[in-house]
Amino acid sequence: MGILWIVTTQWRAQACGYADDPNVHTPNLDKLAIESVDFTQAVTPHPFGPFARAALLTGVPSPENKVVDYFDPLPDDARTIAHDLNDHGYFTAFFGKWHLSKRNPDAELVGEEHAKVIIPPQNRGGFLFFEGFESGFLINDPWLHGTRLETPTQFKGYQADILCERASAWIKSEQRPWFCVVSLEAPHPPYASNASGIKPVEPESLQLRANVPGESKIASKARTELAGYYAHIEATDRAIGKLIADIPTDTVIVFTSVHGDMHGSHGLFRKGWPHEESIR
């Protein structure tokens, strides 16, 4: 039996078809939700990525897990879910965004420097197989390295498509009980980046949440960003759907996001706020 844990970035819980968002197209997640338990009141352990990822992997919140600053690495001796499942006979694998290794705080957050950081084996959280990247927010043409790729190698295409395809191939090759994390950067900014052929809708056609101030610059900015945001959600939903269709039907699937995005709700943007759109 296998366990698949899909982790996305900045995908708020409200932005799904099954959650009654009128703007979004998520047929694969909608189908999964019908067959699943939906934890409607679950919130992130922290509304910023590294802190949430460290807590999700270790079960220990910040600062107790020693990830105190945005650029703090997960300590090499931190015990994660991978260690526990290794001990119980599972073969553990991680694909995608790590965001818990040492990186240059002065480098551009969006770009190749963080994307090409090599995560040393002792800093991969105990996963027996690893193929991913530190950060960089390269939603297209990601750089991957790990167990089979000693140096960062660029793959052409949409990040979610590439990671889901490579995770699927690994899963299909496994005969042992397995645990696989697929960690995707989408739908994190930059929202204007290509969304695997999904064309953004016209911003003016979008229905904003009731708590977004009406006729204002905030509403205009929210519409512009949401057009790209929803395109990336649709593209990521499609990649996830292909992955789920490829793997054994008895797989236990967990889907979550490390945090959401305000998108103009209460006049605010991005994450880090103690509001529903940011924490759930």
Segments the model singles out, each with a brief description of its role:
Residues M1-I3, V37-T40, H88-F91, L128, ...:
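Loop/turn elements at helix/coil->beta-strand transitions in domains of secreted/extracellular proteins
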